[in-house]
Amino acid sequence: MSYKQDHLNQAMNERTHSWDPPLDIAKKLLNLDKDDRRKLFTELKPDSFGIGSLMGFTKIEIDEKGQASFYCKPEEYHYNPIGSVHGGLAATLLDSCNSISAQCNLDKGLIALTTDIKVNYLSQISVDTGEVVARGKIDKLGR
């Protein structure tokens, strides 16, 4: 039996997700100062925005300095074809927490976008790893 035939005979898993309209959050963000941005992101449910829902983020924390922590419990749907969690999950967690940390440290009317990201993977992530946490810390805001 070929892989394709064997694969077609197996039951497929399903997962659904929902999210709030992302532009609603973005429009609010532009009109908020640093303190109100921190409050907005502290109150934001991790599954209420598209990427948080899609990737299965479980918790967001924002400290008094605006540094963000994003949490996720790896699940089977995060796996790649070689049997480990896809590296994109770690990269997305890092990008998300760094972005939110930046937003929480910007003045009203400004937003920041990621222009570059480099991830060095130190070990494999699997469902056995348990909850993973990414923490964003802003050392310097650039232009």
Each PLM stretch: what is its role?
Residues 1-143:
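Terminal targeting signals and extreme-terminal segments of soluble enzymes
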